[in-house]
Amino acid sequence: MQKSGLIKLCFPAAWLVATSWMFAAPAPIQRGQLKHGAPLQAEQKSVPAKPAPAKAAPAKKTAPPKAAPAKKPAPAKPALAKKPAPVKPASAKAPPPAPAASYGPRAPYRGAIAVDADTGRVLFADNMRTPGYPASVTKLMTFLLVLEDVQAGLYRLDDRAVASPLAASMEPSSVGLRPGQSMTIHDLLLSIMVKSANDAAETLAEHAALAHLRRRGAPPQDVSPADLCAAFVARMNRRAQELGMRDTRYASPNGLPPPRGSKRGFDVSTAADLVELGKVLVRMPKALSYTSCPSCTVTDGAGKPLTLVGHNYFIPKNPDPKRLCTPLPECDGLKTGFTNASGCSIMLTAHRNGRRVIVVVLGSAGRHEREKAAGHILRDALDAISIW
């Protein structure tokens, strides 16, 4: 009886000792889980575990491994999903549609201007300082320099200029010059003003450069056609600066785009610059006699007559086959220009009651846009000077 009573008294005490871990353990587990970011409610559910003393120690060891896997997928997967957003591919495709230095055609034009040739008064201006490719309007500077050489007595209009292989290789428009063939300066000037012949412009450029070398006493036989052309183009740019054509850069005597693989670049100008060239040309003796020709006959390099038909349909007696513009009786020049890269350009001049205007339309998207814009601007300019 005493043993059983002692056992009864000792059993509650032993039970309390064995189960006392259940009341002391939860607090540290909760603090540990909060430090690692695990939710407190989820940890509280695991507190009322079975009171087996042997499982108490493993319970603490297995808790951290469960929390660790929970941390890995949560931050890693969403972060990776945000990084491959399609922002960078879009920015990589943005630059190509906007090339850095593209001065191609625009509707209705890249720039336009009309001035009173006598006073310099601007009658109309729209983007007059916007650069563009003048195409064959470039030939007007070649035309001016050759006329100035003739005036200076460097050579005469009836002198003959010989076509080089470089000149003969120019693409159309052309008068069909072959290497070694020659034409008079007069006929070559008609060829570039009426027909817009690229081979004629190159031949004139080389002939003019050669004449300047001879005047300085340089040996011309050691100079290639390409070097002669480069010397003439340098002179074109010097003359442009003298005329105040500050945004103009000539690269050829004819306005053709650069060949593939070439480093020379395009001829570049503005409507405001080109009108400065026009002011000088309309004061040049005999200049308008060339620019006002609707058609003419020259003697080609083979000694045969060659009829040339002009492209300026604002000039009287030169009807437009496509009827895109109506000739003006007062119009007597100057030059059209077109390439695929440059679009359509034109410089016009006309006079009324002793007053003269000059109009430039640069870089139109097509002939229709060019003729429409140039016709409106020219007629309005003539009306404006008539009432002043």
Which residues fall in each region the model found?
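Short, well-structured active-site flanking segments
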Residues: E148-L166, A287-C293
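Signal peptide-directed extracytoplasmic domains
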Residues: A168-V194
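Sec-dependent N-terminal signal peptides
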Residues: Q2-A27
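Beta-lactamase-like hydrolase cores
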Residues: P28-G37, E43-K50, K55, K60-K61, ...
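Surface-exposed aromatic
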Residues: T130, S169-S174, P253-G261
